């Protein structure tokens, strides 16, 4: 095969991929024209009927934002008896641990110090935390997340109306500092298009949904 033929073949594949991507996004756009907002929180809630949730948050060298994270978690509206929050720390991350211990930790927040290892990744930390998860729904947050206070109630409402084969829920993300700079505005527009247009459209097309690494909720039974 000549170099020219290989080039033309590669070029054709790339063009076809671009066309397919554009067609998929166009189809998702059309399908998502009628945007369905997330499930509303009922006016009155029977707390005993809410699913029990575990939230996993892996931190590494996050001392500057640790106190803000704990404060944001403290604003969550959900029965403490139905909530388990596990903050995972690496064994050598003493500064983040000290920053967290200086805060007033709610009783439903647990600190898990994992064994020292040469590899320090979010996946490894979450796998450690998963071993002690005891709730029906497992959620994943990042250190910089600032969930709306009623977000878990909305998650519970969506699971309550979903069929049993719906095991995963990706909540929408947005930037809280969208107006800070031109770059933050661009990111905010990108996230808005992705989570309010593209992903809802893919869901209606019954396509595979790409999941993010945060604000993600799964049934414990599938993990």
How would you describe each model-predicted region?
Residues 1-47:
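N-terminal membrane-anchoring/stem segments of glycan-assembly enzymes
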Residues 51-54, 84-86:
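Cell-envelope/extracellular polymer assembly enzymes that use nucleotide-activated donors
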Residues 54-62:
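A conserved hydrophobic helix/loop-capping motif in glycosyltransferases and polysaccharide synthases
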Residues 62-75, 95:
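Short, well-formed alpha-helical segments that are part of the catalytic scaffolds
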Residues 74-117:
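Acidic donor-binding segment of Leloir-type glycosyltransferases
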Residues 104-105, 113-131, 135, 149-223:
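Long helical/loop segments within the catalytic core of UDP-sugar-dependent glycosyltransferases
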Residues 138:
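Short aromatic/hydrophobic "clamp" motif used to bind/position activated sugar donors
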Residues 142-146:
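The conserved acidic donor/metal-binding loop of glycosyltransferases
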């Amino acid at each position: 095969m000549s170099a020219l033929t290989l080039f033309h073949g590669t070029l054709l594949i790339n063009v076809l991929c671009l066309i397919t991507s554009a067609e998929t996004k166009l189809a998702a756009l059309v399908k998502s024209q009628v945007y369905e907002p997330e499930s509303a929180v009922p006016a009155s809630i029977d707390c005993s009927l809410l699913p029990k949730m575990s939230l996993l948050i892996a931190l590494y060298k996050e001392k500057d934002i640790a106190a803000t994270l704990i404060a944001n978690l403290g604003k969550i509206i959900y029965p403490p008896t139905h909530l388990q929050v596990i903050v995972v720390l690496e064994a050598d991350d003493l500064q983040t641990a000290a920053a967290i211990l200086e805060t007033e930790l709610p009783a439903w927040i647990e600190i898990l110090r994992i064994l020292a290892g040469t590899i320090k990744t979010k996946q490894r930390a979450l796998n450690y935390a998963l071993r002690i998860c005891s709730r029906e729904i497992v959620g994943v947050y990042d250190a910089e997340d600032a969930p709306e206070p009623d977000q878990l109630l909305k998650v519970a409402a969506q699971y309550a109306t979903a069929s049993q084969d719906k095991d995963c829920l990706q909540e929408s993300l947005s930037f809280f500092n969208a107006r800070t700079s031109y770059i933050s505005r661009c990111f905010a527009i990108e996230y808005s298009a992705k989570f309010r247009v593209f992903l809802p459209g893919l869901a209606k097309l019954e396509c595979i949904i790409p999941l993010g690494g945060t604000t993600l909720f799964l049934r414990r039974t599938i993990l």
